[in-house]
Amino acid sequence: MPRILAATAGSFVLKAYFHRWRSLVILALLLAPLLWPLQYFAERYYSEQLAEQNRQTLDLYVANLLGTLRRYEELPQILGGLPVLRQALQQPGDPLLQKIANEALADIRRRTGADVIYLLQPDGTTQVASNWAQADSFVHRNFAFRPYYREAMQGRLARFFGLGTTSIKRGYYFASAVKEGSRIIGVLVVKVDLEHIERLWGNSPEQLLVIDNYGVVILSSREDWRFHASRPLSAAERDEIHANIPYPVQDPKPLRLQQSAWLSQSRTLPETGWTVSIYAPRTLIERPVRSVLLIGGATLLALLLLLTLLTLSRRHYLDRIALEAEAKRQLEERVLERTRELENANAQLQQEVHEREQAQRELMRAQDEVVQAGKLTALGTMSASISHELNQPLAAIRSYADNARVLLDHQRTEDARGNLEQISDLTTRMASIIAHLKAYARGARRAPENVQLQPAIEDALSMVASRRRAMNVELLRDVPDAPLWVQAGETRLRQILGNLLTNALDALAEKAPPRRLWVIASQDQHGVTLTLRDNGPGFSEDALAHAHEPFFTTKTTAKGLGLGLAICDNLLRALGGRLEMGNHLEGGAVVRLHLLPGVPGVAAMPQEETRA
């Protein structure tokens, strides 16, 4: 009898356990579909995060690419005015002159970092080139078939990307006509090597590519994508490719990409007609999504196990409740203790999740700030600022040279000698400006010096005097006769004043006469204030809000890069001063320079000039 009861009880227990586990399996199957919305939202979240990251990366690389191109954009026009190059075109039979021109281009190429600089005759034959002494010299080679030659001969600034037929190297070409009056006497070409940008792209996990106006990949972080067509080419496009030879292949093969495997973003560059795209593999999304699914599955499993434990505990409690009350009390205490542990663990987990999310937000914000600071630093130290800073002394040199020519025609040699001395002083000043800008790019800091303000004002006014008189601008000065000593540097102070006076004349050029320019200096217990005012159109609200930012300008690209006020602001800050801008109540712009007071009668050695 006891054996029968025991067997019956055992069979009952087995059926009960089987029933419980079957219920748990059914519950698990019902909860499993909850992982699908978890996967959907996880993919959406990480896709948005990756898209934002790709956008920032694309902005950074686009800024780098445009910065590289803009660095050389105006170089052909500037070099086209060099007398030695003009003489080389006018006297092609003079071997000594040709050698001097070749060496001049080679030196300019080394200093600017360009790949090749060469000068074409009107028929497209290379007269002089920076690589004249190399095996792949361009001298005596004809490039009349190139589109940049044809566009430059039409008087336009030409752009072209293609494969060099002589060097077999890819490059971006800028070309500009060299004119003698209205007659085109040649074409100056600057070739820029962009392969270093590809090498920079190769260090990132994303894949970047640049597509030209034909739809062909010309730059890419993957070599097997280069010179493949991203879309079908028309017959006319194929004919142009055969005629211009922009690629090492005459018939680009289609670029076969499995779009579903990539997350892409693109940016069009109107200046070049290119499209820059970034491709990130979707595996960057799949990995964190799998982690989320694993965590979600583990959470569901933990819930099932918890339900199992609770069910078994409850069943055990119900089975034994009739046998002993003490066991009931102990079981209740155990369940309560376990519940408290789970609650504590859950609270701790929530706290850790909150801290992790907060740390992630802080990290992303810090990364955004670092990226923005890196872009401003890279853009602020580009050598484009050199051409901007040299515009004023170059314009003054041209004016003095034109006046000297007229004076010599009238046999006024003493006056002409004075102009030549002014030109010599300006070239010394240009060398000092270049030395200072190099130190500025390296982040060097020199202590301010005790200098007089009046000589710097006179120098800056003399640099723009010819243009001011030509524009019929009335100069109104209110500067004390007693020396005003400030803490500055002579070169830096002249740079700042020259930039601001040039900006004032640019603004007055947009206004009909009468034109007036005020220069006012005053001193108080806080320092020296120099005020420059004009009766031009004044600053707009947008200009006042962004004037201190690099590359912000209301001028066209040919008239300015937007670096002048940013450079003046940085120089003044380095001197302990500040720059204020506003509009006068009677109309026109007002710019105030606040400078720290210097020690009267104590002039330090001009470190900027001596070290230049």
UniProtKB/Swiss-Prot annotation:
It catalyses: ATP + protein L-histidine = ADP + protein N-phospho-L-histidine. It is an enzyme of class 2 (transferase). GO terms for biological process: positive regulation of organic acid transport. InterPro entries: dCache_1, HATPase_C_sf, His_kinase_dom, HisK_dim/P_dom, HisK_dim/P_sf, Sensor-like_sf, Sig_transdc_His_kin-like_C, Sig_transdc_His_kinase_DctB. Pfam families: dCache_1 (PF02743), HATPase_c (PF02518), HisKA (PF00512). Autophosphorylated. Residues 328-376 form a coiled coil. GO terms for cellular component: plasma membrane. The modification Phosphohistidine is found at residue 388. Keywords: ATP-binding, Cell inner membrane, Cell membrane, Coiled coil, Kinase, Membrane, Nucleotide-binding, Phosphoprotein, Transferase, Transmembrane, Transmembrane helix, Two-component regulatory system. Its EC number is 2.7.13.3. Residues 385-599 form the Histidine kinase domain. The chain crosses the membrane at residues 23-43, 292-312. It is a multi-pass membrane protein. This is C4-dicarboxylate transport sensor protein DctB. The gene is dctB.
